Swiss-Prot record:
The lineage of its organism: Bacteria, Pseudomonadati, Pseudomonadota, Gammaproteobacteria, Enterobacterales. This is Potassium-transporting ATPase KdpC subunit. InterPro entries: KdpC. The gene is kdpC. It comes from Cronobacter sakazakii (strain ATCC BAA-894). It holds the Pfam family KdpC. It is found in: Cell inner membrane. Part of the high-affinity ATP-driven potassium transport (or Kdp) system, which catalyzes the hydrolysis of ATP coupled with the electrogenic transport of potassium into the cytoplasm. This subunit acts as a catalytic chaperone that increases the ATP-binding affinity of the ATP-hydrolyzing subunit KdpB by the formation of a transient KdpB/KdpC/ATP ternary complex. One of its GO terms (molecular function) is ATP binding. It is a single-pass membrane protein.
Length: 190
């Protein structure tokens, strides 16, 4: 019985600390130091939320750039069901999916030069990637330019403006934020 009181006191103390004080402190500090990130890194346009800087969206019209395919459950780009397809590289189902995506992209981008960039036909581990490489964006540029009736040079300028450099200049690779790029295209010509 003598051990019960300290054990219960410790239980109550740690419950209050880890279940109340710590979450409250991290929320307050997060809102204070990292307001944008704590609120989901949202992109707003005319006081309307268009999406998150960190979560991909489906774009299917020819006038928009397309991101990586989504492998999330239930619906594409579902942030509540993040995850890959878990198909092994040796799985014939993955090969069929990739071939179907290659054929669809080739049909939608008949003027594209070179091979279809691999990230446009394979889903990421999260299934929610927001960005593509500049090469994948430039590969789609002829289609977008033609659909919008603007020059490839203008589309290329927008791609370069919406390319984020690697962290510290050398960690990772340049990434084009597909949502921001498509919004820039709409601002140029809706």
């Amino acid at each position: 019985m003598a051990m019960l009181r300290p054990a219960l006191t410790l239980l109550v103390f740690l419950t209050i600390l880890t279940g109340g004080v710590y979450p409250l402190a991290t929320t307050v500090l997060g809102q204070w130091w990292f307001k944008d990130q704590a609120e989901g890194s949202l992109i707003r346009q005319h006081d309307e939320v268009r999406g998150s800087r960190l979560i991909g969206q489906a774009f299917s019209e020819a006038k928009y750039f397309q991101g990586r395919p989504s492998a999330t459950a239930e619906a594409p780009y579902n942030p509540m069901a993040s995850g890959g397809s878990n198909l092994a590289a040796s799985n014939p189902a993955l090969d069929k999916e990739v071939q179907a995506r290659v054929q669809a992209l080739r049909a939608a981008n008949p003027d594209a030069r070179a091979a279809v960039p691999v990230e446009l036909v394979t889903a990421s581990a999260s299934g929610l990637d927001y960005g593509i490489t500049p090469d994948a964006a430039f590969w789609q540029a002829p289609r977008v330019a033609q659909a919008r009736g603007i020059s490839e040079a203008e589309v290329g300028r927008l791609i370069r403006e919406n390319t984020d450099a690697p962290l510290a200049g050398f960690l990772g690779q340049p990434v084009v934020n597909v949502l921001k790029l498509n919004m820039a295209l709409d601002a140029l010509q809706p």
